[in-house]
């Protein structure tokens, strides 16, 4: 049976990784309908590496740099499949990923998103992602307060409903995936499989948090707060916004981080993150980045040891 899944890959300066990523798609036991790569104004040889693969499944689209959200949206708009399987240009799939997604779609129809578990590759070892342990339709907002349910490279979306929600928020440089997950999970069920079929590259050089710059966007997590929404829904919004604000503060965005600390002070679940943000934001800017990096390294070391 012909696949109804289009693979969507935003690409920006990944000439060393993109061939490996594409080979992981072409090695799938169940082949996709197409692979759409949107080169978002790369300044290295990324586009040339894509062309060298030479697969008829691959369609390369080149555009001026507009950000990862615009690249993903462009790919979904150009796609033909009912579903869009997201994959970043430095992550990879295990050979059975698409087959597992197709099995989930057959077993749990009418969901807005389907995802699997993943491993984190830090360049030295694989560490299991902290994800749910059971299969099926999940209570997304409750699960996402303590686990990773959706990350871009492990998630396949029903394409047209996502586009009808506006797609990914263009101009948002960090947290754009969580912004969309919030809107999607408020309108559609989310399905999950604990099979670890994705490798997320923690060693990537230009992940959004590593290259944060001031945003020029009309989108904000504040827009997602709904007084009438379930508590877990608003708690998820606060969690995403405060996590982003930590990075913003470390990069010198004192006023923006202070605004987030004030607006999302309603959180009960993430009081520790709120306190950490307030303390970090009160320090001299030159201290913030090194302190946050040290904290994150310690947290990652603890996670790897399973403590």
Please identify what each model-predicted range represents.
Residues 247-248:
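Residue-level signature for tetratricopeptide repeat
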Residues 237, 241-244:
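Structural register within alpha-helical repeat arrays
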Residues 123-126, 244, 283-287:
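Short, solvent-exposed polar/charged micro-motifs at secondary-structure junctions
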Residues 181, 218-221, 295:
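A general structural signal for well-ordered alpha-helical segments in protein cores
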Residues 143-144, 196-204, 208-235, 254-267:
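Catalytic core of nucleotide-sugar-dependent glycosyltransferases
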Residues 1-214:
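Nucleotide-sugar donor-binding/catalytic module of glycosyltransferases
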Residues 254-307:
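Membrane-interface aromatic/basic loop that binds lipid-linked glycans or pyrophosphate carriers
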């Amino acid at each position: 049976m012909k696949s109804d899944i289009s693979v969507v890959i935003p690409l920006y300066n990944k000439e060393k990784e993109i061939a490996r990523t594409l080979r992981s798609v072409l090695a799938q036991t169940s082949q996709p309908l197409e692979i759409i790569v949107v080169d978002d104004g790369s300044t290295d040889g990324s586009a040339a590496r894509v062309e060298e693969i030479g697969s008829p499944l691959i369609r390369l689209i080149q555009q001026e740099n507009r950000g990862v959200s615009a690249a993903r949206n462009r790919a979904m708009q150009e796609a033909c499949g009912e579903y869009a399987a997201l994959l970043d240009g430095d992550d990879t799939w295990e050979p059975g990923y698409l087959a597992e997604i197709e099995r989930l779609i057959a077993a749990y129809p009418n969901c807005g998103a389907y995802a699997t578990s993943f491993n984190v590759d830090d360049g030295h070892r694989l560490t299991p992602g902290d994800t749910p342990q059971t299969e099926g339709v999940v209570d997304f907002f409750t699960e996402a307060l303590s686990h990773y349910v959706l990350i871009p490279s492990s998630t396949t979306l029903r394409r047209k409903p996502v586009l009808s929600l506006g797609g990914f928020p263009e101009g948002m440089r960090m947290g754009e995936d969580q912004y969309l997950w919030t809107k999607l999970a408020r309108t559609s069920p989310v399905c999950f499989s604990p099979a670890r079929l994705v490798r997320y590259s923690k060693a990537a050089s230009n992940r959004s948090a590593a290259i944060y710059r001031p945003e020029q966007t009309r989108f904000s997590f504040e827009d997602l707060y709904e007084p009438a929404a379930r508590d877990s829904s608003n708690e998820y919004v606060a969690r995403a916004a405060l996590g982003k604000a930590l990075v913003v503060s470390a990069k010198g965005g004192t006023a923006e981080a202070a605004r987030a600390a004030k607006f999302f002070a309603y959180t009960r679940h993430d009081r520790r993150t709120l306190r950490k943000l307030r303390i970090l934001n009160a320090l001299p800017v030159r201290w913030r980045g090194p302190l946050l990096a040290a904290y994150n390294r310690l947290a990652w070391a603890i996670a790897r040891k399973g403590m």
